[in-house]
């Protein structure tokens, strides 16, 4: 098979690329899957198998009442090869879908190699193919040569090589009796939620930050992190001095709770906060809030413990923890449509961690949609996007519509789904309703698509 006879090329043999190539081939379209290993290795991989799980062997919670579990179920219903293989090789892991990673990756490699329409090509791709239908699924450790070409294609401002992200919190879990909505000096629209701290609260918070247990950067991440002096972990700022945070991300000047009066009134001077943690709106609906300046290397359990000491966040529900690690990803809101096509070149698609989704299952979901749409383009059909009420649809709607200025990778979570018609306070019941709506709407979507393409096997 050559590039001219193959209708689609997939670059990258991780979870996203494996899923994408399978969906293209299952639609009857010849595909070349490029994987650079073992010709060129990465610091994180240990084998030449496709879909190697380089970190945990877990795909997250199995229950469809959980965000990851709902995404599993959606992919299961869409005939995902990744989830089918994970189900087949699952190992006991409590409530999580975990796999025997060696057997899992080996079977996927054999399955794709044996497909008559898939050619697995072991070579490093150093250029983005200039024509034809192409899916980029090169992952967080994209080779330096291809990363440079991708950076040239997208523009310098639209590539990130180190993921320094603050935690993201569900808005409903923030105590609005304490947190107040305001912008500094009342300039412009009140765009931030602000959590005020008095001196005692601030010093306790700083002490806990300084002694909290940190996660170690991997060896290959340390060099990249050296260039990030301008984006230091919050615990590093805390250790540099008692007031360092108060003159940095926790700066209180110009922030005052209007419920307490006019901050310009000298009589209210004693009411002004000693320090302020600011939360910035993360999505259009205002359901998710980002802790401004709180990129961190703390272990996840420590983040929850320490950050819940902040007044107003005592019951905070985290949908994403703060991270600092090597992660090549593009600015998807600037570059991609919800179909995962590049706006500037609709025959070029992308999937996986490269587009700013987080986690194994989300990478597989991106591979499914990119592969499905690449096949549809090859067949002369319109690309699809899934309903925003599904976890898949909501995730790709988010990464293609979030603020480009503040875009950071996002895992699947219920906070990105549209509100239910009726507010439900019980979390378990609310998540169950999200699940029921998502699966019903996914079923309707499949039915409608199949009615319009009787001869296609993309969706069954």
From Swiss-Prot:
Protein name per the record: Methylenetetrahydrofolate--tRNA-(uracil-5-)-methyltransferase TrmFO
CC terms in the record's Gene Ontology section: cytosol
Organism, scientific name: Crocosphaera subtropica (strain ATCC 51142 / BH68)
Catalytic activity: uridine(54) in tRNA + (6R)-5,10-methylene-5,6,7,8-tetrahydrofolate + NADH + H(+) = 5-methyluridine(54) in tRNA + (6S)-5,6,7,8-tetrahydrofolate + NAD(+); uridine(54) in tRNA + (6R)-5,10-methylene-5,6,7,8-tetrahydrofolate + NADPH + H(+) = 5-methyluridine(54) in tRNA + (6S)-5,6,7,8-tetrahydrofolate + NADP(+)
InterPro entries registered for this protein in UniProt: FAD/NAD-bd_sf (IPR036188), MnmG-rel (IPR002218), MnmG-rel_CS (IPR020595), MnmG_N (IPR040131), TrmFO (IPR004417)
Record's function text: Catalyzes the folate-dependent formation of 5-methyl-uridine at position 54 (M-5-U54) in all tRNAs.
Cofactor: FAD
Lineage, highest ranks first: Bacteria, Bacillati, Cyanobacteriota, Cyanophyceae, Oscillatoriophycideae
HAMAP family xrefs: TrmFO
PROSITE patterns in UniProt: GIDA_2 (PS01281)
E.C. code: 2.1.1.74
Family membership noted in the UniProt record: Belongs to the MnmG family. TrmFO subfamily.
């Amino acid at each position: 098979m050559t590039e001219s006879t193959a209708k689609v090329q997939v670059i990258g043999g991780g979870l996203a690329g494996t899923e994408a190539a399978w969906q293209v081939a299952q639609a009857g379209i010849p595909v070349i899957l490029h994987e650079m290993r073992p010709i060129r290795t990465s610091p994180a991989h240990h084998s030449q198998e496709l879909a190697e799980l380089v970190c945990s062997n877990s795909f997250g919670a199995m229950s469809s009442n959980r965000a990851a579990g709902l995404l599993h179920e959606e992919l299961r219903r869409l005939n995902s090869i990744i989830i089918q293989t994970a189900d087949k090789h699952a190992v006991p892991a409590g409530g999580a879908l975990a796999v025997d990673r060696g057997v899992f990756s080996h079977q996927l490699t054999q399955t794709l190699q044996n497909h008559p329409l898939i050619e697995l090509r072991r070579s490093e791709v150093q250029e983005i193919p200039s024509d034809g239908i192409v899916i980029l699924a090169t992952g967080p450790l994209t080779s330096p040569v291809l990363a440079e070409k991708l950076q040239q294609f997208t523009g310098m401002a639209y590539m990130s090589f180190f993921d320094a992200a603050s935690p993201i919190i569900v808005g409903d879990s923030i105590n609005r009796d304490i947190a107040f909505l305001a912008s500094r000096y009342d300039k412009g629209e009140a765009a931030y939620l602000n959590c005020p701290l008095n001196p005692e609260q601030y010093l306790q918070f700083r002490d806990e930050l300084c002694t909290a247990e940190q996660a170690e950067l991997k060896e290959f991440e340390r060099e990249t992190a050296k260039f990030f002096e301008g984006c230091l972990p919050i615990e590093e700022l805390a250790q540099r001095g008692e007031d360092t945070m108060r003159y940095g991300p926790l700066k209180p000047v110009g922030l005052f709770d209007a419920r307490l009066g006019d901050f310009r009134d000298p009589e209210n001077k004693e009411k002004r906060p000693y320090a302020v943690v600011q939360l910035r709106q993360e999505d259009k609906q205002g359901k998710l809030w980002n802790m401004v300046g709180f990129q961190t290397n703390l272990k996840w359990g420590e983040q929850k413990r320490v950050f819940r000491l902040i007044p107003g966040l005592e019951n905070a529900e985290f949908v994403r923890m703060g991270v600092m690690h090597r992660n090549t990803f593009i600015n998807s809101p600037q570059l991609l449509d919800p179909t995962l096509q590049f706006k500037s070149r609709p025959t070029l698609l992308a999937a996986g961690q490269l587009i700013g989704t987080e986690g194994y299952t989300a990478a597989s979901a991106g591979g499914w949609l990119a592969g499905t749409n690449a096949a549809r383009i090859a067949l002369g059909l319109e690309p699809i996007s899934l309903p925003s009420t599904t976890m898949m649809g909501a995730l790709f709607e988010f990464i293609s519509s979030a603020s480009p200025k503040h875009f950071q990778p996002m895992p699947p979570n219920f906070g990105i789904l549209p509100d239910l018609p009726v507010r439900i306070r019980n979390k378990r019941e609310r998540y169950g309703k999200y699940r029921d709506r998502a699966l019903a709407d996914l079923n309707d979507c499949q039915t409608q698509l199949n009615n319009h393409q009787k001869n296609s096997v993309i969706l069954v």
